[in-house]
């Protein structure tokens, strides 16, 4: 690698640009961004592959830190470092259903990290608290609630990067979704038992994505499309999907890839604190979560990220 001031040239054996592989190339970096790609002398290249980093929009924790429990800049740094080991270079730290106080602390931490120029923090994802109790998954019923001014004040902030909020459209009206969109919030649908018509209204109001497709959402049946059916057939929205071998069957994942336009299916981890550690259990609200290999479950056997 050749470096001069804010200019760098990196010669590699293989480069993936997101569409195709390039061989024996040098990458010209200017002020932290790729400016050009050109052929390189084979004698100069290093025998490595250079690929774009992963962007994960649903990250609850990592490195032993859980963002709900530790809504701090220090925890964010720990999470970023843990996920960087596995190729993720941009994260949306995720706060699941919790008190307004925790949401405010998490927003403060993200704002401070961004202001300090901490790498890897793209914004914040609030997964809840405006969800469906029947489809809550491991979210605490104690904190599931309607949208109020207290949460809107958090969502209105302009210092927390990209803002994403997952809601159940049967509990958050189309007008409220429009209000969130007007605040530059990316509204996602999930943890919902809504019928197809309600989901369609939410999309028309400005919702643009679905949180962990097939998990904790109304299913596709013969006479009711549910949230899953609408998600698969709507060409404009995107779907996050957890492909860890536990959450979604591979056939369902193939169906999503066949049904959705290119670029509309996103891999997410829904990662918890054990990422990058040997941690085998951790406290989770009033209970605990246990790790068995790559599988996390609550004391009641429910999947937990």
Regions found by a protein language model. Give the residues of each.
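N-terminal metal-binding scaffold of metallo-dependent hydrolase/deaminase domains
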Residues: 1-40
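Active-site glycine- and acidic-residue-rich loops that bind
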Residues: 99-105, 170-173, 188-193, 242-254, ...
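Divalent metal-binding pocket/active-site signature
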Residues: 126, 132-149, 154-226
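Active-site-adjacent C-terminal substructures of enzyme catalytic domains
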Residues: 198-305
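Divalent metal-dependent hydrolysis catalytic cores, especially in the metallo-beta-lactamase
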Residues: 60-62, 77-106, 119-132, 159-170, ...
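Divalent metal-coordination and catalytic microenvironments
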Residues: 13, 27, 32, 47, ...
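Charged helix-capping and loop-helix junction motifs
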Residues: 73-74, 106-109, 148-150, 223-228
């Amino acid at each position: 690698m050749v470096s001069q001031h804010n200019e760098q040239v990196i010669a590699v054996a293989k480069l993936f640009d997101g569409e195709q592989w390039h061989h024996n190339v040098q990458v010209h970096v200017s002020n932290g961004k790729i400016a050009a790609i050109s052929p390189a002398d084979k004698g100069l290249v290093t025998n490595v592959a250079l690929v774009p980093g992963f962007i994960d929009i649903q990250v609850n924790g990592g490195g032993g830190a859980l963002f709900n429990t530790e809504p701090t800049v220090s925890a964010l740094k720990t999470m970023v470092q843990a996920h960087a080991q596995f190729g993720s270079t941009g994260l949306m730290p995720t706060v699941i259903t919790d008190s307004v106080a925790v949401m405010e602390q998490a927003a403060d931490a993200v704002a401070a990290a961004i202001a300090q120029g901490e790498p890897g923090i793209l914004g914040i994802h609030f997964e809840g608290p405006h969800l469906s109790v029947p489809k809550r998954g491991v979210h605490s019923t104690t904190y599931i609630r309607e949208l109020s001014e207290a949460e809107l004040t958090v969502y209105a902030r302009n210092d927390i990067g990209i803002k994403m909020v997952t809601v159940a459209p049967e509990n958050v009206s189309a007008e409220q979704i429009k209000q969130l969109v007007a605040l530059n919030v990316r509204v996602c649908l999930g943890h919902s038992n809504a019928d197809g018509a309600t989901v369609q209204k939410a999309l028309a109001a400005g919702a643009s994505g679905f949180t962990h497709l097939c998990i904790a959402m109304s299913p596709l049946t013969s006479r009711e499309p549910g949230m899953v059916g609408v998600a698969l057939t709507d060409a404009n929205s995107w779907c996050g999907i957890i492909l860890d071998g536990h959450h979604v069957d591979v056939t369902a994942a193939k169906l999503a890839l066949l049904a959705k336009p290119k670029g509309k299916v996103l891999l997410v981890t829904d990662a918890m604190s054990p990422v990058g550690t040997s941690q085998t259990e951790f406290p989770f609200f009033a209970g605990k979560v246990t790790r068995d290999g790559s599988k996390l479950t609550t004391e009641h056997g429910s999947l937990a990220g």
